[in-house]
């Protein structure tokens, strides 16, 4: 613990907490200050000046990062018949119906993404209390309730991320690993930023992006100048 604290102090000394860095500077600092012994994830965080209590200011969606996330996604699909076969052919890790519902209700959660065809939502809805709090419930807005299960599986395997503003207007997203080349992290960051910018509600008032930052797992939070994106 003392060693980790020493590493954190050393990392903090390299970052000016009063400064908003350019995206290139921020990414370089994330890589430089990372002290995790594993290939840490890199995440961005946005504090948006929105009121999610208003229906027209709720922000939620999905996108495919140009350079992927570096994370292997275990994809579960609720489908039957031909659609189940399509999901398997596309690379889904788990495909089923009521059998999967029973397994999940029994405590099994070894998957990262859940996709369902519309006709399966009647049985998937039984898992609301399990999947909902974990942000795993299939939703049309994130492309996880769809008849095109093959495309959904391929996108999830290929770097698709989902995002959602919480009650305080905060949005977090994984954009890669510290092992990524800096230019690939920058490209992923800019792609996500573009999505956030376009998601601005027409009724939002004041400065839309109150704060933007980037960090690695166990790392230091680094402020980013939105204008550099």
Curated annotation (Swiss-Prot):
GO molecular function annotation: rRNA binding; structural constituent of ribosome; tRNA binding
InterPro entries, A to Z: Ribosom_uL1_bac-type, Ribosomal_uL1, Ribosomal_uL1-like, Ribosomal_uL1/biogenesis, Ribosomal_uL1_3-a/b-sand, Ribosomal_uL1_CS
Gene Ontology CC: one annotated term: large ribosomal subunit
GO biological process terms held by the UniProt record: regulation of translation; translation
Entry annotated with the keyword Ribonucleoprotein: yes
Keyword terms, alphabetized: Repressor, Ribonucleoprotein, Ribosomal protein, RNA-binding, rRNA-binding, Translation regulation, tRNA-binding
Record Pfam families: Ribosomal_L1
NCBIfam families noted in UniProt: rplA_bact (TIGR01169)
Family indicated by similarity: Belongs to the universal ribosomal protein uL1 family.
Assembly information from the UniProt record: Part of the 50S ribosomal subunit.
Function: Binds directly to 23S rRNA. The L1 stalk is quite mobile in the ribosome, and is involved in E site tRNA release.
PANTHER family: 54S RIBOSOMAL PROTEIN L1, MITOCHONDRIAL, LARGE RIBOSOMAL SUBUNIT PROTEIN UL1M
Protein name: Large ribosomal subunit protein uL1
The organism of origin for this protein: Streptococcus pyogenes serotype M28 (strain MGAS6180)
């Amino acid at each position: 613990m003392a060693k980790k604290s020493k590493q954190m102090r050393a990392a903090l000394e390299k970052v000016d907490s009063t400064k908003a860095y350019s995206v290139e500077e921020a990414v370089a600092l994330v890589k430089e200050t990372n002290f995790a012994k594993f290939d840490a994830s890199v995440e961005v965080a946005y504090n948006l000046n929105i009121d999610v209590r208003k229906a027209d200011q709720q922000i939620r969606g999905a996108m495919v990062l140009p350079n992927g996330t570096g994370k292997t996604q275990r994809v579960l699909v609720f489908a039957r018949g031909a659609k189940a076969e399509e999901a398997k052919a596309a690379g889904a890790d788990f495909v089923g119906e009521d059998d999967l519902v029973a397994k999940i209700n029994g405590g099994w959660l070894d998957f990262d993404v859940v996709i369902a065809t519309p006709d399966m939502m009647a049985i998937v809805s039984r898992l609301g209390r399990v999947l909902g709090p974990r942000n795993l419930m299939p939703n049309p807005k994130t492309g996880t309730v769809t008849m095109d299960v093959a495309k959904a599986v391929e996108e999830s395997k290929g770097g698709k991320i989902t995002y959602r503003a919480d009650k305080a207007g905060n949005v977090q997203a994984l954009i890669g690993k510290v092992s990524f080349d800096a230019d690939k992290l920058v490209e992923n960051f800019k792609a996500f930023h573009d999505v956030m910018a376009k998601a601005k509600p027409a009724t939002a008032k004041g400065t839309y992006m109150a704060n933007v930052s980037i960090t690695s797992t166990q790392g230091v939070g680094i402020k980013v100048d939105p204008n550099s994106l």
